[in-house]
Amino acid sequence: MNPQHHFIGLSDQQVADSRAKYGINVLTPPPTTPLWKQFLEKFRDPLIIILLIAGVLSVAISIYEYIGLQQGAEVFFEPVGIFVAIFLATGLSFYFETQADKEFCVLNQVNDDEPVEVIRSGNHTQIAKRDVVVGDIVRIGIGCEIPADGELLVATQLSVDESTLTGEPLCHKTTDTALFDSKATYPSNRVLRGTKVMEGHALMQVTAVGDATENGKVYKAAQIDNSVKTPLSEQLDWLGLWVSRLSCSIGVAVIVARIVMYLAQYDFCFAEVDTLAFIAYILQTLMIAMTLVVVSVPEGLPMAVTLSLAYSMRRMLKTNNLVRKMHACETMGATTVICTDKTGTLTQNRMSVEEACFYRGGEDCKSIIDANKILLDSSDFSNEIKEGIAVNSTASLDFSNPAAPSVLGNPTEGALLLWLHANGVDYEALREEVKVVEELPFTTDRKYMATVVESALMPGKRMLYVKGAPEIVYDLCASTDGIPSKAAVDAQLKLYQQRAMRTLGFACQEIGDEKVIVDGTIHADKLRFLGITAIADPVRNEVPESIGECLNAGICVKIVTGDTAETAKEIGRQVGLWTDKDTDRNIISGPEFAALTDAQLDALVMDIKIIARARPMDKKRLVEALQRKNQVVAVTGDGTNDAPALKAAHVGLSMGDGTSVAKEASDITIIDNSFKSICKAVMWGRSLYQNIQRFLLFQLTVNVTACMLVLCGALMGTEAPLTVTQMLWINLIMDTFAAMALASLPPSEAVMNDRPRDRRAFIINRPMLAEIVGVGGFFFALLVALLYIFEHADIQQLTDIVRVQIGESSTVTPYELTLLFTIFVMTHFFYLFNARAFATHRSALHLKGCKGLIFISTLIFVTQVCMVELPGVQRFFNVVSLKPLDWLIIIVGSSFVLWIRELWSLLWNKK
């Protein structure tokens, strides 16, 4: 690098002064709607409006009873109870949705923590984007999102996507004033926060941070995208609409039935009907019908889904999965194929030079020991290797910890710099002493990079250095004097690749003043092949087990890598994907893959396990071919060129150290890059779906029981079996409380033993439907039988039922109605545990990690007891105290719901 391009950057004191003067690099979020307004918005919900109308009707009835019938002030307890229930349900819903919104704000926080490479006090280091200050010197490269506004100091073939600010998709940036675009919105040497580097690399000096940037003036907070309608969300919308219509029909049926039964008492002789009493009865009927509709409509379903997503997103973040688009949570659970990169995902991405083979005029260096010796001498050959590695690179080392320097930038290039450093070669000094004339950045299509410099180690020489895939670099070389044949080099490469090593080839040529980099290629007629390095990148310890989990879960795993077939095959063997039974049909190279017709690809795609020497568009085509086979595809990517594949997949998985372009195109960011985290995301996705099924199972079972009981009560002509406030309490249990309890259930590793579900299969499957109808029908039959007994016999306590004598129809007493209400609640209380264990074949009492369920169930039980036994509360719910023996009978009897399920589970597990 030219000496005038050696930058020191800011000192620690200058950083502190700049931050104090210009502020931090964080954008102030736009003002949000005040909480009180958000709360009032809840009262615009149609169901809340219906409840408010019911409350007003209840007030009207109470006024009639108080004034017209001269009853006591206790008649107002029911309307008060209705309004308390409305505010309680609305308040809880508002609170938990607010908490969920806080979870969704995590995206902005993570964006501000993105790593940025800067030069400070002469050292290259990484800091969080929020810590960038005015005056900082920042390195930007392909795929980076520019962290602040700044002015370019050095730029190499830099193109920036400014479409987010100016609408220009590609702007060429340069420091050469002669090449400035006079028509550009901003000067060609100025780069802006939030825009993205699409090609090249550069150094910039920050001129504005935070709200002072151009982006800050038009800032809108990053949002987690919930706009995509998945098959599940469409199903839930349809289910909610269907249940709502059915509930309204039942509500109308209740109104008609109650009016008919009332008029039947007078043989439909309207002259004998007390008008005021009839109006009061009509109002009471309307109130019951509207409340029944409110209870039946699954308004808790959206909250259950929201809570499940929020809980899943928070816990997934702890397992290194940052959800960027909410639909991905659910879709990951239906994934049937995962297309994964190799480097960093299956391997540790901790690269080191393990072997080297250099060729010096017939004198071969075939070991790392020999290569180390070459670095220590001062021959031209040694200088070509040292200088070529140092200057033909975009990586740097961070010496913040001198004992263990870390790599900034490309890990493969970083391994070479670490090798130089370990042998006492100061790569920074070499960069500072040379003058860079031309550069050709690396691309996945080209598979090599080149740099032209005026040499410092060989004064007076202008050198072209090339580095890249060995077979590509070797083919570029014209001079083969003293160099082994292509076959010999290929044989050496194969030995390295069979040990899962990544190989790089090096070449150089002394040139004159002519331009050798033209239109993205090098034009050199005497390029000389220097040799090869073999870089080891060990497999992550946890990956073989995670691959096994995915295969056991019925998920196909495919490796898509730029490495050679031998390297990829060996990695596949180490992680348990490639076996002795696999053949050439299971592995294909990028060029061979590109040559396939769509028909040929469709016939082969499910058999392919590895694509070697793959290019980014190969990955996209693979995704599309799998989708044609009705597969649900998740794909990983970390580079800008991976964006098309990430967008095409059902779930795009970007890597934590990937480019900003890749992250923006993805649905989930794997923060630690590990395949194990991908496996965890699948487990969370499946568990999320299962939790929603559990909530639906519980809610619809309660719906069936409540609707049929109230309708049957109306047809029987009895007093309403459940009062409005009682139904609202039941609604609170099955909607809000059940959503809280079942949405927060921890994921079960057992879901990884199941095959992937059909993504378009209806969420209510046959076992669920059978249980909803069966259990709901049983509860309904039990309660109707009790209601019939209560209507035709005087029950003082439950033990009277065994010796009851059915007589004439009579009024159901408050004690009997309290028994009915409490039995309803307690049977469903115990059924909540059954719903938690649905489809697991595990005990319903296995509550490890279910803190939310334990808390909610305890709250329901204690509240029900207080509601029935506390005199100050009884009046709101039209209940009376129960005898201790009746409590014991109800609890023990209702618990049979649980024990029958436990017996069934025990018998099933013995099969």
Q: Residue locations for each model-derived region?
A:
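Generic alpha-helical transmembrane segments
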Residues: 734, 815-832
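Core segments of transmembrane alpha-helices
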Residues: 702-706, 774-783
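Conserved cytosolic headpiece of P-type ATPases
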Residues: 1-756, 761-764, 821, 838-911
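Alpha-helical transmembrane segments and their membrane-interface junctions
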Residues: 778-793, 864-875
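Alpha-helix capping/termination and helix-coil
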Residues: 630, 682, 686, 781-793, ...
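Glycine-rich phosphate-binding loop plus the immediately following alpha-helix
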Residues: 470, 474, 773, 777-778
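Helix-coil boundary and interhelical linker segments in multi-pass alpha-helical membrane proteins
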Residues: 714-723, 789-815
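Membrane-water interface at loop-to-transmembrane-helix junctions
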Residues: 759-777, 807-819
